[in-house]
């Protein structure tokens, strides 16, 4: 009996690491089944859809090359597809050959860029989002009344740079509360504020509140000047975060609204990650996860999101996919007249 007991102890000692390893592998595996919840609305907004359609139709009607000032939208997959169709993307308007066909991106451009385009006799199609154009109009009206204009936004964002160009001597960009505290204006009774369109009411609330305390007579836009799509997608991701263990945001790292969606999800306490495509999915993220929420920034194509969903399905033995509908979007923006009649 002693020899059998001794043999048992030897076998147990040698096998224990293998049993522990097996248990650990089982614990670390993604769960057998998964629930996938897709936020709605998500992905392309009306401004992005319009901008991409302008480039596509211009290529169909006029052929290549079509030059585009800046990335038409902040998504490398969209840009690459259009590049393969004959679009040429440039950062400097002076790079576009004289007399060529050119398109302004959805983010808008400054009056200085428009003047250069005129001097170079470029045949321009304007894909600026109408909501961005509206903000430019607000800046012009404040400038005509000799107001100091506070632009709430990200200093280096291309949209902000275009808006500043409407009144460079009058516009001050602020991105945080400290910058509000440091503001110095020539006349505190003549101050107005405008916002970057990819920010939402939630994003700007604290800064607007601080501005109103600093400048009690400050004027600002109506609520409907805020981009509907940004607000809707943030509301959707908040609702999504309450129903899942992990949120995946499909979008580019240079997409302001995609990065903000990630931040909004994380502020709810849920685990959240941003990815550009299915190729970035990592099984390690899904250990012990029973439900995954998926959304996409305003410049992320639906087929890329569906690729992510397909990739997730492959990682689990079974899956249940459903939409979480927050609000119905029916917004569309008209194409330039020259493309509508062609």
Where are these regions (language model features)?
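Short terminal hydrophobic/aromatic SLiMs and anchors at protein ends
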Residues: 8-9, 15
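The feature marks the mature, well-folded catalytic cores of soluble enzymes
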Residues: 19-296, 302-342
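Generic short N-terminal amphipathic or hydrophobic helices
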Residues: 9-10, 33
């Amino acid at each position: 009996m002693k020899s059998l007991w001794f043999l048992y102890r030897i076998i147990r000692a040698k096998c224990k690491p293998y049993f522990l390893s097996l248990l650990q592998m089982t614990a670390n595996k993604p769960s057998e089944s998964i629930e996938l919840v897709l936020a709605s609305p998500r992905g392309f907004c009306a401004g992005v859809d319009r901008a991409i359609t302008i480039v596509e139709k211009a290529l169909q009607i006029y052929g290549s090359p079509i030059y585009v000032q800046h990335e038409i939208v902040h998504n490398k997959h969209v840009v690459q597809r259009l590049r393969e169709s004959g679009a040429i993307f440039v950062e400097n308007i002076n790079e576009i050959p004289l007399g060529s066909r050119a398109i302004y991106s959805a983010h808008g451009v400054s009056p200085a860029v428009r003047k250069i385009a005129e001097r170079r006799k470029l045949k321009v199609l304007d894909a600026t989002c109408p909501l961005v154009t509206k903000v430019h109009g607000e800046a012009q009206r404040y400038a005509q009344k000799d107001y100091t204009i506070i632009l709430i936004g990200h200093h280096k964002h291309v949209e902000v740079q275009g808006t500043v160009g409407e009144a460079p001597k009058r516009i001050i960009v602020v991105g945080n509360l400290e910058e509000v505290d440091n503001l110095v204006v020539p006349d505190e009774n003549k101050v107005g504020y405008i916002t970057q369109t990819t920010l939402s009411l939630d994003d700007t609330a604290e800064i607007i509140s601080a501005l109103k305390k600093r400048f009690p007579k400050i004027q600002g836009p109506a609520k409907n000047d805020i981009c509907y799509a940004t607000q809707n997608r943030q509301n959707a991701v908040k609702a999504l975060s309450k129903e899942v263990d992990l949120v995946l945001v499909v979008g580019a790292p240079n997409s302001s609204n995609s990065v903000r969606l990630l931040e909004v999800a994380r502020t709810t306490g849920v685990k959240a990650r941003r990815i550009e495509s299915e190729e970035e999915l990592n099984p390690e993220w899904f250990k012990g996860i029973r439900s995954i929420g998926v959304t996409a920034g305003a410049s992320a194509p639906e087929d890329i999101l569906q690729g992510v969903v397909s990739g997730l399905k492959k990682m689990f033995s079974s899956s249940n996919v459903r939409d979480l509908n927050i609000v119905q979007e029916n917004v569309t923006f008209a194409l330039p007249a020259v493309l509508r009649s062609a």
